[in-house]
Amino acid sequence: MKKIRKGDSVVLLTGRDKGKQGIVTAVLENKLVIEGVNIYKKSVKPNPAAGVTGGIIDKTMPVHISNVALVDGNGKPSRVGIKLVDGKKQRFLKTTGATLSA
């Protein structure tokens, strides 16, 4: 069971965007794509066959999962634990003990 999932609110712990909060939009192997965080400029060549115009675009790049933490109800970073509830795994916040939706 992954500790961080799509739709979770997270905060960046390291890097140039340290302290920024955002919503997870995609989960890759060990990386997350977070809305509004880790944005880089990429140059794109024009491709008329695909209908792509060339130029410089802003692209959201993935962040390693170890560099983020979930945000609890107080807006502070929290680690995530997993416990068994009625034979099913349930995620919970270690700072407050609150359970997260499946």
UniProtKB/Swiss-Prot annotation:
Q: Name one GO biological process term.
A: translation
What Pfam families would the database entry show? KOW, ribosomal_L24
Among InterPro entries, the record links this protein to: KOW, Rib_uL2_dom2, Ribosomal_uL24, Ribosomal_uL24_KOW, Translation_prot_SH3-like_sf
Listed GO MF terms: rRNA binding; structural constituent of ribosome
Q: Is this entry keyworded Repressor?
A: no
| Listed Gene3D superfamilies | 2.30.30.30
Q: Which GO terms describe its cellular component?
A: ribonucleoprotein complex; ribosome
Q: Which UniProt keywords apply?
A: Ribonucleoprotein, Ribosomal protein, RNA-binding, rRNA-binding
| NCBIfam families in UniProt | rplX_bact
Q: How does it assemble?
A: Part of the 50S ribosomal subunit.
Job description of the protein: One of two assembly initiator proteins, it binds directly to the 5'-end of the 23S rRNA, where it nucleates assembly of the 50S subunit. One of the proteins that surrounds the polypeptide exit tunnel on the outside of the subunit.
Protein family according to the UniProt entry: Belongs to the universal ribosomal protein uL24 family.
Protein name stated in the entry: Large ribosomal subunit protein uL24
Q: Which organism is it from?
A: Polynucleobacter necessarius subsp. necessarius (strain STIR1)
